[in-house]
């Protein structure tokens, strides 16, 4: 046996051992499955299998803290082997047959990540549902929409908020589509060219609830792209949430006063009694930055020749921790959205004097006066400048003045049409095309998103049941064998 230098233990094995709490349970499942595969292949006797499974089931009953995961012994697989040797004797060495240590840990990683992908997709569905519920509730709540933090056009808080649901749905669908590749088996890969023992790779895959074996054994052992894609989708999921969090912090400021965060989302200042710091939003923003950094790190590690373990050694813990963080952030934003207090009167008052009707006024001049849009734009710009001299927003009189000043006939503009320009709800009700801000359109969009989230939940449930059933069946079969 090779001696482990203190330097290698501290810098290398300790890094891997730190991931034991994450992978311990999945390693138990992977080892039990491999022991049963060895029995099915006739590689070990029934008696030895019973002894080995007895030790593995004992190991399965223990938390990782009670297993001697010690970097002075080696990495996780070596520590587990030593634990089993001490427990059941030399038969523990049978787990090496037909399988490398990397196959064991990569199987465990896939078992962990496949569940995390499903859980994160479930969390995404809950966020979509929360956004849709609040969007329907506020489909009539007037507010100015902004670009560059400048008032652009009248909208509703419901229409604004709903714009954050579609990106969540897209990322959720990307996560679920990548689950197919994560939920594939590396069992039977052998060292480099296949296993001489585990020949029925399809059976080995199904025993663990994987949908199929990854066909090329070298690709199976060294592929990184499914994990990178999952991490990318988790990062873009939180990036979209960061955008909403950034906006909410601005809208919750005293200067805007559009909304307040619920008490469960804020942290009081220890010095200044009046302050309600939006702590939840800081957590969302900071966590997104962490995930961007972790994604960048994993991409950098993948830039290597093929068949290099460092692409995985530094992913075993980082990837599950990152997916867990993305789930925590998503659940946090869901809570924030549910508890938001919307100040409708303040939002509506922000439209007054903001000139958000200007583009509609220019379009009206196009229709009524036969102007091209550039000329109509200049007329309305002149009206805005004229009104600004008195520090106010434009009115019908300002538009009339600008038309006359520009040499156009204001009588061509119908008075009732001009009055409607200054009714923000009337303008919003006119936006009935697909994706528009009309309340009925917003409600319909939210309904479609809710249906899509429900469909996702149904598909997730089937995948979850398949994985849990396979793992449960493995444990039942192992216990029955031991009890014979």
Where would I find each of the regions flagged by the language model?
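Conserved hydrophobic residue
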Residues: 44, 49, 256-257, 371, ...
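A helix-coil-helix interface module used to build multimeric assemblies
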Residues: 1-185, 191, 199-203, 264-268, ...
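Generic, well-ordered alpha-helical scaffold segments in large soluble proteins
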Residues: 34, 38, 55-62, 83, ...
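Leucine-rich amphipathic alpha-helices with coiled-coil/heptad-repeat character
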Residues: 63, 88, 131, 135-138, ...
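Charged, flexible cofactor/metal-binding loops and thiol motifs
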Residues: 110-125, 136, 150-304, 309-329, ...
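Alpha-helical structural context
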Residues: 87, 207-208, 368
């Amino acid at each position: 046996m090779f001696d482990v230098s203190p330097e290698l233990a501290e810098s290398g094995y300790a890094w891997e051992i730190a991931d034991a709490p994450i992978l311990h349970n999945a390693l138990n499942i992977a080892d039990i499955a491999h022991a049963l595969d060895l029995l099915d292949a006739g590689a070990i006797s029934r008696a030895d299998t019973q002894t080995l499974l007895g030790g593995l089931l004992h190991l399965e009953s223990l938390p990782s803290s009670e297993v001697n995961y010690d970097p002075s012994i080696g990495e996780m697989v070596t520590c587990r082997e030593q634990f089993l040797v001490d427990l059941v004797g030399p038969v523990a060495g049978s787990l090496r047959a037909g399988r490398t240590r990397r196959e064991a840990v990569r199987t465990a990683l896939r078992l962990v990540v496949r569940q995390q992908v499903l859980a994160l997709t479930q969390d995404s569905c809950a966020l979509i549902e929360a956004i849709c519920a609040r969007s329907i509730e506020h489909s009539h709540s007037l507010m100015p929409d902004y670009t560059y933090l400048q008032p652009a056009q009248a909208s509703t808080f419901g229409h604004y908020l709903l714009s954050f649901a579609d990106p969540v749905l897209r990322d959720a669908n990307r996560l679920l589509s990548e689950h197919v590749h994560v939920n594939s088996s590396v069992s039977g890969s052998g060292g480099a060219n296949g296993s001489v023992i585990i020949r029925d790779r399809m059976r080995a895959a199904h025993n663990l609830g994987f949908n199929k074996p990854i066909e090329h054994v070298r690709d199976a052992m060294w592929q990184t792209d499914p994990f990178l894609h999952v991490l990318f989708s988790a990062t873009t999921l939180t990036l979209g949430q960061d955008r909403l969090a950034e906006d909410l912090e601005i809208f919750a400021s005293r200067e805007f006063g559009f909304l307040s965060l619920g008490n469960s989302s804020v942290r009081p200042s220890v010095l200044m009694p009046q302050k309600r710091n939006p702590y939840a939003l800081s957590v969302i923003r900071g966590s997104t930055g962490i995930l961007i950094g972790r994604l960048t790190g994993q991409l950098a590690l993948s830039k290597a020749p093929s068949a290099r373990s460092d692409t995985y050694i530094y992913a075993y813990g980082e990837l599950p921790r990152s997916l867990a963080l993305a789930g925590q952030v998503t659940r946090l934003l869901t809570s924030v959205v549910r508890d938001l207090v919307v100040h409708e009167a303040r939002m509506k008052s922000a439209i007054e004097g903001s000139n958000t009707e200007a583009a509609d006024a220019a379009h009206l001049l196009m229709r009524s006066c036969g102007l091209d849009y550039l000329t109509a734009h200049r007329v309305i710009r002149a009206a805005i400048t004229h009104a600004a001299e008195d520090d106010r927003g434009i009115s019908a009189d300002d538009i009339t003045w600008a038309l006359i000043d520009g040499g156009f006939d204001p009588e061509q503009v119908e008075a009732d049409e001009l009055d409607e320009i200054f009714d923000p709800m009337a303008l919003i009700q006119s936006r009935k095309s697909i994706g528009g801000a009309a309340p009925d359109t917003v409600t319909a969009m939210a309904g479609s998103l809710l249906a899509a989230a429900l469909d996702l939940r149904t598909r997730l449930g089937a995948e979850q049941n398949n994985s849990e059933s396979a793992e449960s069946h493995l444990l039942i079969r192992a216990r029955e064998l031991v009890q014979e």
